[in-house]
């Protein structure tokens, strides 16, 4: 009788082990299938972004890129420039250590797990940035709202010398102030759309026509920002930080063009997806073979 009881216990133990192993294998298979579907979705979204870039005419963007030659030629190393950036006293609270402002469907600074991150480096006076944003921002907003992407915005202001009134710095400071004092990221994306609108973005150099703070303020309010926030957005609170960004960012070799006229230098606009740099010059070539 005792032997029968022991045998029954052994059989039960073996059955439990087999059941546990089967459950583990099933869970592993389900996880692998989930990861496969996730990677397929990520690949599809990345491809969609690239198709948009090609469709808007990468030629137009590429040939209107701007290179920050002064800061790139600086004798500071990228490590020294990074250290100086971290030492800036009035750093925006929402940006990461490399200057990125992350937006997702969950708000500022909250990454959607599994969604690819699209990073855009821009200057508000840069004509290539205008070409890019005029066609891309609406789609990016839809992808953000759907939780399909995380959007990582990097504001720069090295093109002040191509305006008569520090337009790049004033616009970038206003955008950062907006993000810091208005919790709705859609207001910032709408502000970008309006700032880069063809009937608003000024031309550069000798064709530049002065844009007042009040004109920029109107774009903020039209984007859903309160008058109280808009009124206080022009103190250039983050100028020291922007100056440090303009020195550090162009020295990041992972952002350098890998071909074309601007090879081995950083330009605006720059686009990365999950940290991978997408060379606008190569997108131009892609456009040639797909048109």
Annotated model-derived regions:
Residues 130-213:
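Structural alpha/beta surface segment adjacent to cysteine/selenocysteine redox centers
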Residues 64-77:
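Ser/Thr/Pro/Gly-rich low-complexity linker/stalk segments immediately outside membranes or between
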Residues 1-40:
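Terminal targeting segments of Actinobacterial cell-envelope proteins
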Residues 289-290:
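Conserved small/polar residues in nucleotide/adenosyl-binding loops
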Residues 123-130, 271:
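The canonical Cys-X-X-Cys-His
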Residues 112-125:
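Short active-site neighborhood of thiol/selenol oxidoreductases, capturing the structured segment around
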Residues 175, 179-278:
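Thiol/selenol-based redox catalytic cores and closely related redox-interacting motifs
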Residues 46-57:
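Hydrophobic membrane-insertion alpha-helices, especially the h-region
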